[in-house]
């Protein structure tokens, strides 16, 4: 009996399957390679320092050319001044940002403590002012109110100090050492950290106003003048900057005085050296003038001795 025709099953190759899948997934893939999508460059908010320095170098290199036209030189000089100003502003901005990050947490802690002090003193002042005549007499009440008013004024200056301290200068903390002192006092006094008035815990690190940092007094003055915002932004000349300028001025004047003194000493020494040279020249001239005369005299003396001896010989 003849066998039925049964063709052998042929297994498809893997590349055929992948080709069919690619063709089904991307019908237009055979047209060419896929185009790359270029993302737009991120625009920086502030100029690059390296780019500004490169522009300044290029402009200076161009200005060093002797054959540069006058109008082009004027344009390049203006561009150079603009680039230098931008570079200076960018460096100042970076230094300011660095100082803000460095002292941010310290300022936050001081501001928090100063705010608590102001709120407590305000509550204390309200309690004393609302107290009746049975609690305390009028004289004691007025005395306490005056003391609280002074403490409240100092506390408000402290709060403004923490808020409006110049952002581009090194921050000097007000409460860092005070917390340690309060802990130590509490351990010594057996946990009794308040006096009869209940305001001892609000004391500052510095015992008196005179002991406070120089910037504290600048903040107090700016509170009266209404220029706290300008002080914070560095638009006012603070005590530290003024002191730095005075110190640099003194150093410059001292260097100028030293140079003048050295030049004067050089002048005196040169004049003395000139005088000594003149004296030596005169002595040399005298020696030279005396030399031929002495030689002539010596020759004459020798001739006289010879004549006398010769005469004596011939006479004999």
Curated annotation (Swiss-Prot):
One of its GO terms (biological process) is maturation of SSU-rRNA from tricistronic rRNA transcript (SSU-rRNA, 5.8S rRNA, LSU-rRNA). It comes from the Eukaryota. Keywords: Coiled coil, Nucleus, rRNA processing. Its main location: nucleus. One of its GO terms (cellular component) is nucleolus. It is found in: Nucleus, Nucleolus. Residues 33-44 have a biased composition (Basic residues). Residues 237-265, 275-302 have a biased composition (Basic and acidic residues). Residues 1-44, 237-316 are annotated as: Disordered. Involved in rRNA processing. Belongs to the EFG1 family. PANTHER family: RRNA-PROCESSING PROTEIN EFG1 (PTHR33911:SF1). This is rRNA-processing protein efg1. The gene is efg1.
């Amino acid at each position: 009996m003849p066998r039925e025709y049964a063709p052998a099953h042929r297994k498809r190759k893997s590349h055929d399957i992948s080709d069919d899948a690619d063709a089904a997934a991307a019908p237009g893939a055979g047209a060419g390679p896929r185009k790359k999508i270029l993302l737009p460059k991120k625009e920086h908010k502030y100029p690059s320092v390296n780019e500004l320095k490169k522009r300044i170098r290029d402009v200076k290199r161009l200005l060093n050319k002797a054959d540069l036209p006058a109008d082009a030189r004027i344009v390049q000089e203006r561009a150079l001044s603009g680039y230098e100003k931008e570079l200076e502003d960018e460096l100042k901005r970076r230094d300011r940002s660095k100082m803000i990050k460095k002292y941010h947490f310290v300022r936050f802690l001081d501001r928090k403590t100063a705010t608590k002090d102001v709120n407590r003193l305000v509550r204390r002042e309200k309690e004393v002012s609302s107290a009746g005549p049975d609690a305390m007499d009028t004289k004691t009440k007025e005395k306490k109110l005056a003391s609280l008013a002074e403490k409240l004024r100092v506390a408000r200056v402290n709060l403004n100090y923490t808020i409006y301290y110049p952002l581009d200068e090194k921050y000097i903390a007000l409460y860092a050492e005070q917390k340690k002192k309060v802990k130590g006092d509490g351990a010594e006094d057996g946990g009794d950290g308040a006096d009869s008035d209940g305001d001892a815990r609000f004391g500052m690190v510095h015992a008196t106003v005179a002991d406070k940092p120089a910037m504290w007094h600048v903040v107090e003055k700016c509170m009266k003048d209404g220029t706290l915002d300008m002080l914070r932004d560095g638009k006012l000349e603070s005590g530290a900057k003024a002191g730095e300028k005075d110190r640099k001025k003194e150093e410059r004047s001292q260097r100028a005085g030293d140079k003048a003194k050295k030049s004067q000493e050089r002048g005196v020494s040169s004049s003395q050296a000139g005088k000594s040279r003149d004296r030596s020249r005169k002595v040399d001239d005298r020696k030279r003038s005396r030399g031929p005369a002495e030689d002539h005299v010596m020759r004459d003396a020798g001739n006289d001795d010879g004549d006398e001896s010769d005469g004596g010989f011939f006479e004999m």
